[in-house]
Regions:
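Conserved HGGG/HGGXW glycine-rich cap/lid loop of the alpha/beta-hydrolase fold
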Residues: 1-39
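Active-site loop/oxyanion-hole signature of alpha/beta-hydrolase fold enzymes
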Residues: 28-62
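Flexible "cap/lid" loop of the alpha/beta hydrolase fold
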Residues: 82-110
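Catalytic histidine-centered segment of alpha/beta-hydrolase-like enzymes
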Residues: 201-214
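Conserved alpha/beta-hydrolase catalytic His-Asp/Glu region
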Residues: 112-164
Length: 219
């Protein structure tokens, strides 16, 4: 069984490192295009990511997407594929709010000041806070400004939920996720008919509860 898994940080591959897969299963967990050491261009976009990753996603039996990676995975999914989404939103209104954080005043608070550290420290269960910062907190120089460029480019298609029609859709969610709380996964489950798996985790469910996440992959 081949898994394609995508997060939305330069440290993306580490999100999946604690998951113990069944024998014979493999995982392809690339860094999201434009988030590597080569930097993030001012015109970075979700469509660019899809162009770079679609061929690899087509070879997978299971597509797994977390946060921004969930949006990109939903854009690439084909009918018949199993799709597992975690800690994300497919709604246009949510991402319109994220684009607002790229504006000058908001950018200084969200990105220039904290550079994602607050998102990490307050996103997981309290006992995981320090370990999450250690695992995911170093994104290289200029990360605050790169986050602004990414936020500006978060323009998913309006029919994102409809694109998952015909997929075997599962939601593997941290029950204590503060950034994508219950109303988001409940609405997504209701609109898509997805099977919901609630895990003992905050936002970073694949890393915080790898055993529960692995069970969701096999469900």
């Amino acid at each position: 069984m081949k898994i394609f898994a995508l997060h939305g940080l330069p440290t993306s591959p580490r999100l999946w490192e604690r998951i113990q897969l069944p024998e014979g299963w493999t995982i392809d967990a690339p860094t999201c295009p434009g988030l590597g050491l080569d930097g993030t261009s001012e015109d970075w976009s979700l469509d660019y990511c899809v162009e770079q990753l679609q061929e690899r996603a087509n070879r997978a039996d299971i597509l797994v997407g977390h946060d921004m990676g969930g949006v990109i995975v939903a854009m690439m999914a084909k009918p018949g594929q199993r799709v597992v989404l975690s800690g994300t939103s497919l709604g246009a209104v949510y991402w319109a709010g994220i684009r607002m954080t790229a504006l000058p005043l908001a950018h200084r608070f969200f990105y220039a000041k904290y550079a994602g550290k607050r998102f990490l420290r307050q996103g997981g269960l309290p006992e995981h806070a320090d370990d999450l910062v250690d695992a995911f907190g170093d994104h290289g120089p200029g990360w605050g400004d790169r986050m602004r460029r990414i936020a500006k480019g978060m323009r998913p298609p309006n029919d994102l939920i409809e694109r998952l029609d015909g997929c075997d859709l599962h939601l593997a969610w941290g029950r204590s996720d503060p950034w994508y709380p219950a109303r988001i996964y409940q609405q997504l489950s209701r609109k898509t008919g997805a099977q919901l798996h609630l895990l003992d985790a905050g936002h970073f469910a694949p890393w915080e509860d790898p055993v529960g996440f692995e069970k969701a992959l096999r469900a």
